[in-house]
């Protein structure tokens, strides 16, 4: 006798194909750059990365007169915008002052570039923290002339080295 053919299993109904649309991911650095777009376009402020940190680098030309640690009043709206950008981001905030390698004048209230860099970081901290929801997130540091980003042998290089960095950890490191 011939065996009966096996019962045919009905196939499941066809599932419509859904095309996956790749939605671009807005990264943390993109959010910060967007929040500071006007300041970046105006010059003197950049947003980049350094190791596990996102760094808002502020040129000294926006901040201080040569050899001074008293903020220029025109930095106030920039400080407010930096605080607004960072209010939306998690984690601690470090404000780090940097100088060129030109020693402070003997008449200066600052005995070293390290002292000047710390005083400048504290001045930026005071203005930015004033605008933050949680000012306790902020710590300051000064590096003096120890972390140049350009050649101190040229005027342009020295100008680039005079800066304050506002740093936050990349969110994936928290």
Protein language model regions, located:
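Extracellular/lumenal/periplasmic "stalk" regions immediately C-terminal to a signal peptide or transmembrane helix
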Residues: 1-48, 74
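Generic, low-specificity signal for short hydrophobic/alpha-helical stretches with a mild N-terminal bias
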Residues: 18, 29, 38-40, 46, ...
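Periplasmic peptidoglycan-binding/anchoring modules of Gram-negative envelope and division proteins
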Residues: 29-46, 56, 67-97, 101, ...
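A generic structural signal for beta-strand entry/edge sites
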Residues: 51-55, 163
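Short, aliphatic-rich beta-strand segments
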Residues: 54-63
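Periplasmic OmpA-like peptidoglycan-binding domain that tethers envelope proteins to the cell wall
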Residues: 63-73, 98-174
């Amino acid at each position: 006798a011939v065996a009966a053919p096996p019962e045919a299993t009905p196939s499941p109904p066809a599932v419509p194909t859904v095309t996956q649309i790749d939605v671009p991911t807005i990264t943390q650095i993109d959010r910060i750059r967007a929040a500071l777009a006007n300041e970046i376009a105006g010059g003197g402020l950049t947003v980049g990365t350094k190791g596990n940190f996102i760094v808002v680098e502020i040129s000294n030309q926006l901040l201080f007169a040569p050899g001074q640690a008293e903020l220029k009043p025109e930095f106030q709206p920039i400080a407010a915008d930096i605080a607004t950008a960072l209010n939306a981001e998690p984690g601690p905030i470090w404000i780090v002052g940097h100088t060129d390698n030109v020693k402070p004048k003997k008449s200066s209230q600052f005995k070293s570039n390290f002292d000047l860099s710390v005083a400048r970081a504290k001045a930026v901290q005071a203005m930015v923290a004033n605008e933050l929801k949680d000012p306790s997130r902020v710590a300051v540091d000064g590096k003096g002339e120890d972390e140049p980003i350009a050649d101190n042998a040229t005027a342009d290089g020295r100008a680039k080295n005079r800066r304050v960095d506002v740093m936050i950890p990349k969110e994936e490191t928290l």
